[in-house]
Structure formats: C-alpha cells, structure tokens
C-alpha cells in the first residue's frame, strides 16, 4: 500500500469527481489516476531510473502530478522552494543527493551551480503524455517517498524522509480526528513546499476529496474561493488566518480550519471566531520529525484556549525531567512522543528511537492536555533562570497594537543572556513593558526592544528565529 493506491478505486467509483482544481485548470479522478500512472511509468522507463526526484515548481497541478508519480514509481520526491537562492538550491540538492530536478525554464538560473541533471517541465510532459498507464509494481510501505527540509527556524536546515506507512497513518488522523472525507472540498492556499500544505493536498487525494489549489496565498483570493466554491476545509497557518480574520464578508456555511497552531495565541483564535462565527477550528501541534502529536477540537479550543490539545488517537506522549523520569501534571519537562507517524530519520542520520523528542518543552494538565513552553535549544538562560521566548511572544501578540513579535536571547556580560523583543506594529517600548508587567514575572520581561518593518519567515510561515538573532547581533541598535 502507498499514498497513491486509492486513486484507482476512486476513479472507478467516482470517475467524474474533480480531483484537483486550480485557478486555470482541473482534472477528474479518472484522468488523475491515469496521469499519475503515466508519470510513474515515465520515471521508471528512464535509462537510469532516478531514486530521488527534486521538484522545483510553483503551486500547480503539475507539482502534485510529479510528486504523486514519483511516489507511485517508488522514488523519493524532494520539493525545492522557488524562493530559495541559487546557493540555497545547490545546498539542498547536494544534501538530498537528488538524481534529477524537474523545473520550468524560468527557474533554471537557480540551478546553474548545481551538478544535478535538469529536466524542463514542458519536455517531460510531452514524454509523459505518450507513456503507458500500465499497472505499477508493489512498493514497500516502509520505503521513503518524501524528503523535506526542516524549516531552519533555529539553525541550519536538515533533510528528513517520510515513508508511505507514516503518511498513511497520518491519513487516519485526518479521517478520524479531523473528520475529513471524500465529500470535502479542501482549499490549499499555501506553498506546497511546506509539508503542512503538501500534506493537506495529498491526504485529500488519498481520501477521494477535491483539492482546490491557489498559486500563492492572498486573503482576497482565498475569500473568493471560499465564497464561490463551497469550500468545506481550509488548511492554514496562524499568520494566514490572522490575515483572513481582517477581511469581511466570509460565507455563512461552516468551514473547518486545519491549522498548525501550537504557537497560535488564544487571543488570535478569539478574533478569528468573532470575525467568522461559522468556522470549526482544529489546530494541532506537530513537527517534521514527529508528524501529528496533539490537536484541539473546536470544543477544546473554547474550553482550553491556551492548550496545544490532546494526543491524536494513535499517539502517546510523556513529559520527562532531566533525569529521564516522568513528570507530574503541571511540571515542565521535555516532550517525548511514541507514534507510528514518526519520520524515517535524517539523511545520513541514525534510525529514530521508538520514543522520540525534538527537545520541545511543556507540561500536561490533569486531563492530559498538552501545553507547550518552548524549545530547549531556544531557551534563554537569564542569570540562571530559564525563559522560553514563546511564552513572551504569546503575551506580546495578545496586545492589540502588536502585529507580530519575535523574542530571542542575546549574549550579555552580566546576565549571560537577555531577552530581546522584535516588534511589528504601532506599540512603543513603554506600552509593551507595562503590558508585560501585568502578565509576566519581572525577569521574563524583555530587557531590550527593537521595532521593525518586517520579520523573516521560514517556508512554512514561521518566524525564522535564527535569522532574527543573527540580524540583531550584527546590525541593530536597541531601544
């Protein structure tokens, strides 16, 4: 069984159902099943069959076709971000050891320094259209079909792989815990380079639903599709959802939002619910390595708005102290996860343990709901006291005058490290200090403040903390 094995059965039972709809084209399951088979057979017919296929394409039907075709052929698909510089593309292709990269002529200049063979999309599409749609050989479910890169929010990106089995286990969470089915029309407004949006599209196709794919995120365009296409599910990240909440005139029909939101302030969720009362919000905590860990249902979000939720049906979590002992409810420790959805490992790394941690810190309450404190390697040690930047950011983002915020630790001769806040918005340092004083212990209040016009983000829409820290250390005068 693979992530594509349901396509043929959906094509048989619902041949005319739309599989993918973009701003310029659409395809039925009958044609989608055939196209994926042709793409897989084209890859397998190459003189030297590629094991690893890089995809440097914008959001499009062709992107999903090549991704699914590579998976069906037994290859590992490697999405490459169109926003990366030539040096970044070269680095990722080198790390991944890709056998070929499929791209558009427009992006070919990004690959001039790379040794990876390049195939232009127009050329391969002509060959694929003539390929047979013959049955494909059985693929081992443990075989890696997807290689991604950690977002780099805290350091140098690393490549990781996921197996067919791990994503098929994740699909059961989408079906069981999010209650998404073949009846749903799912809007994917973000870049398929992000595993969150890629997963949203691929899981929808596995379940037999319809993927509605935007070229790139635009609040106005997302609203247009929500109103026009009877969208029932929307995949987002908090920054996108906050932008959507500022737009009026959303449809009255219920829409289910699936958001990776462990760092999503409760106040932002309340604003969204007020602006869009018919939504059903599911936010989850997960990582590239662990996949889904915990989630909050619409009812959970109202009852425990600051929680990252409870474990998915096939996940177990434990909070452990520095000695490896299990923590009591309310006691902060390192989060360990046991899950059939975990990744296969980092490229050139060891096989992951049964119980895994990515060094995130948190605690559980008496009911088993998880609360995220922060990441151990992002922790600020201020005069021997531990400060988690995420806790301060949540407080700052609750201030009406703050649009976005990032908190990092900067070396200090006396304290060891101090917390520095970088702010987008109309607030000033005096206002924010007073705001924090009401909600934080005094030692957690940032000691320095920087006001900026923008904050660097990773490809998944998160603040790139390492770049903020580097920028502060190299060039900024503090307030």
UniProtKB/Swiss-Prot annotation:
Q: Which UniProt keywords apply?
A: ATP-binding, Ligase, Nucleotide-binding
Q: Which organism is it from?
A: Bacillus subtilis (strain 168)
Lineage, top-rank taxon, reads: Bacteria
Descriptive protein name: Uncharacterized acyl--CoA ligase YhfT
Record-linked CDD domains: AFD_YhfT-like
Chain sites annotated for binding ATP: 150-158, 360, 375, 462
Family classification: Belongs to the ATP-dependent AMP-binding enzyme family.
Q: Which SUPFAM superfamilies match?
A: Acetyl-CoA synthetase-like
């Amino acid at each position: 069984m693979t992530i594509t094995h349901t396509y043929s059965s959906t094509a048989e039972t619902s041949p005319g159902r739309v599989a993918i709809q973009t701003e310029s084209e659409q395809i039925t399951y009958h044609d989608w099943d055939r196209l994926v088979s042709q793409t897989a057979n084209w890859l397998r017919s190459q003189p030297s069959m590629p094991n690893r296929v890089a995809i440097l394409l914008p959001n499009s039907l062709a992107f999903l076709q090549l991704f699914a075709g590579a998976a069906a052929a037994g290859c590992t698909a490697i999405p490459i971000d169109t926003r990366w510089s030539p040096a970044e593309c070269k680095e990722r292709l080198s790390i991944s050891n890709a056998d070929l990269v499929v791209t558009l002529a427009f992006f070919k200049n990004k690959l001039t320094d790379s040794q990876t063979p390049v195939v232009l999309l127009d050329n391969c599409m002509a060959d694929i259209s003539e390929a047979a749609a013959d049955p494909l050989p059985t693929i081992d479910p443990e075989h890696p079909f997807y290689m991604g890169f950690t977002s780099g929010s805290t350091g140098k990106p690393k490549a990781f792989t996921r197996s067919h089995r791990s994503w098929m286990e994740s699909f059961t969470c989408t079906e069981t815990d999010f209650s998404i089915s073949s009846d749903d029309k799912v809007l994917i407004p973000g870049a398929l380079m992000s595993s969150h949006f890629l997963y949203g599209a691929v899981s929808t196709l596995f379940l037999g639903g319809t993927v509605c794919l935007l070229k790139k995120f635009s609040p106005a365009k997302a609203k247009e599709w929500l109103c026009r296409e009877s969208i029932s599910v929307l995949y987002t990240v908090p920054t996108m959802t906050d932008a959507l909440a500022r737009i009026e005139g959303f449809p009255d029909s219920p829409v289910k939002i699936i958001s990776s939101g462990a760092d999503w302030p409760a106040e932002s969720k309340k604003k969204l619910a007020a602006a869009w009362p018919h939504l059903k919000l599911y936010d989850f905590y997960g990582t590239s390595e662990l996949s889904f860990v915990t989630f909050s249902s619409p009812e959970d979000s109202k009852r425990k708005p600051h929680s990252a939720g409870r474990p998915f049906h096939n996940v177990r979590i434990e909070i452990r102290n520095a000695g490896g002992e299990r923590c009591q409810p309310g006691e902060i420790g390192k989060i360990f996860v046991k899950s059939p959805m975990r990744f296969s490992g980092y490229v050139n790394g060891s096989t992951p343990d049964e119980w895994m941690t990515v060094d995130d810190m948190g605690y559980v309450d008496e009911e088993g709901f998880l609360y995220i404190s922060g990441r151990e390697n992002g922790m600020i040690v201020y005069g021997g006291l531990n400060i988690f930047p995420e806790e301060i950011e949540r407080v700052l983002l609750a201030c009406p005058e703050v649009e976005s915020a990032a908190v990092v630790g900067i070396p200090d001769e006396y304290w060891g490290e101090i917390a520095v806040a970088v702010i987008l918005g109309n607030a000033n340092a005096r206002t924010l200090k007073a705001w924090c004083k009401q909600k934080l212990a005094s030692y957690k209040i940032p000691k320095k403040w920087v006001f900026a016009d923008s904050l660097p983000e990773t490809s998944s829409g998160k603040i790139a903390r390492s770049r903020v820290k580097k920028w502060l250390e190299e060039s900024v005068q503090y307030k």
